[in-house]
From Swiss-Prot:
GO molecular function: sterol binding
Alphabetic keyword roster: Coiled coil
Keyword ATP-binding assigned: no
Domain of life: Eukaryota
Gene Ontology CC terms: cytosol; membrane; nucleus
Protein name, as recorded: Oxysterol-binding protein 7
Residues forming coiled coils: 354-384
A Pfam cross-reference name: Oxysterol_BP
Key word Transport present: no
UniProt source species: Dictyostelium discoideum
Length: 422
């Protein structure tokens, strides 16, 4: 896969548009006057001054690819308890870099976003790749489905839906939709596939002072992570000032009880510590059938420096040790793409011309409404890259072996590709 150097996403960058002051006069005053307390913001067309210069699909890609290489260590960790710690570390890395001070664009129905990252392999002898494919599969409610596949055979699948409600000078953000991570783990001479379910892609949050004062975000939720294959689970609680605490448990089949095996606490913006506890039986020891000779051989394997920030016996995550990946973008060939459709809106927001951005965005929204009335596209249960599973009630990624073209009445122009409200 080759990168197109001309393509860039502002979801990977920081700029003054993130903290730009909002004037309460003009279009903003008119917009606020139309809102009621508790109103759902994903169903209204928001002025560009409230928007980040990128789509929700771009945000999902940036968030989940930036530290995807952290998961590679789980393949080489023989202790199931510490494998769970690696999953938690990766989840924290996805949360910590979030920015909810403004809202990304609602993705267009049928909008596609593709990108990838390259990083050193675990032993540093080659280069690995992780590819992201995301698609907006429904419009009401707005639902995003995406898949990440790595060279090592790790996959990440997610159906995620965000809702944001207005509360005068604050906005509450609620996330629904689980994340499924599948990892082929090397245990001795065997490869065992483990599946981890994170019950929410992000914790719920409260964004304060969205109009007056200094904007800040407070996480207000707990998240559960489960792995039936290794009989491990974790519950993580989020609090203000990015403080987290939680515990990791292992189900002891010998005693038929769930044992509390580790506690964690700290700040996801700095350091999160972990404290491992002793098991009540020998059964919960590391799930390894490798001989001492094999273990010594494994220890001698030189890790690449990018993979040396795995959780230690006392530190779950030290943000100063994390090395982010740089996102690359292939040539965009799909009819509706995040980087193509919103290009001019993004350009005007970054330049600070909100009037021009609002006008272009309105044209996009108007064209989308016309298209949906004609095509009835919202009723479809199959998109270009995802298909709805009625039994599981989720949108599933069509693997590269089964991808088939789906008739799409949408024009390749940005206006015909337009979505509803943002």
């Amino acid at each position: 896969m080759e990168a197109d150097p001309s393509l860039v996403s502002y979801a990977d960058q920081h700029g003054e548009w993130e903290t730009r002051e909002i004037s309460i006069f003009g279009v903003v005053k008119s917009f606020i006057s139309q809102l009621s307390i508790g109103q759902e913001l994903t169903k209204v067309s928001m002025p560009s001054i409230f928007l980040m210069p990128y789509s929700i699909l771009e945000l999902a890609a940036s968030r989940h690819l930036k530290y995807i290489h952290l998961l590679i260590s789980a393949q080489h960790e023989e202790d199931p308890l510490k494998r769970m710690a690696i999953i938690i570390q990766y989840f924290f890395s996805c949360v910590r870099d979030g920015n909810f001070q403004k809202k990304p664009y609602n993705a267009l129905l049928g909008e596609v976003h593709k990108c990838f990252v390259k990083y050193p392999s675990y032993d540093g002898q080659s280069t690995s790749t992780a590819q992201f494919i995301g698609e907006q599969v429904t419009h009401h409610p707005p639902l995003t489905a995406f898949n990440i596949t790595t060279s090592e055979g790790i996959t990440l699948d997610c159906n995620v839906q965000f809702s944001a409600k207005f509360h005068m000078n604050s906005v509450s953000v609620v996330t629904t939709g689980a994340v499924k991570i599948c990892i082929p783990v090397k245990v001795g001479n065997q490869i065992i596939k483990e599946t981890y379910i994170i019950d929410k892609g992000l914790p719920d949050a409260l964004v304060k002072n969205v109009i007056f004062g200094t904007r800040s975000i407070y996480w207000t939720d707990s998240v559960d992570i489960m792995c039936e294959d290794s009989k491990t689970s974790a519950t993580v609680h989020f609090d203000k000032n990015e403080y987290v605490k939680g515990e990791v448990s292992v189900y002891n089949t010998e005693l038929e009880v769930e044992e509390h095996r580790a506690s964690l606490k700290g700040y996801i913006s700095d350091v999160v510590n972990i404290d491992y506890l002793e098991s009540k039986s020998s059964e919960a020891a590391p799930a390894s059938s490798a001989s001492k000779k094999e273990k010594k051989k494994e220890k001698k394997k030189a890790k690449h420096s990018k993979h040396t920030c795995s959780p230690s016996d006392t530190i779950l995550m030290d943000t100063k040790q994390l090395e982010p990946n740089s996102t690359l973008y292939p040539k965009q060939t799909d009819p509706i793409t995040s980087l193509g459709t919103w290009k001019e809106v993004t350009k005007q927001i970054v330049a600070g011309d909100m009037q021009a951005a609002d006008q272009i965005k309105k044209e996009i929204e108007d064209e989308q409404r016309k298209r949906l009335q004609i095509t009835k596209e919202e009723e479809k249960k199959e998109r270009a890259y995802f298909k709805y599973n009625d039994d599981k009630e989720i949108w599933e990624f069509k693997s590269t072996q089964t991808l088939a073209p789906v008739s799409n009445s949408t024009s390749s122009t940005a206006s015909d590709a337009a979505s509803g409200s943002n």
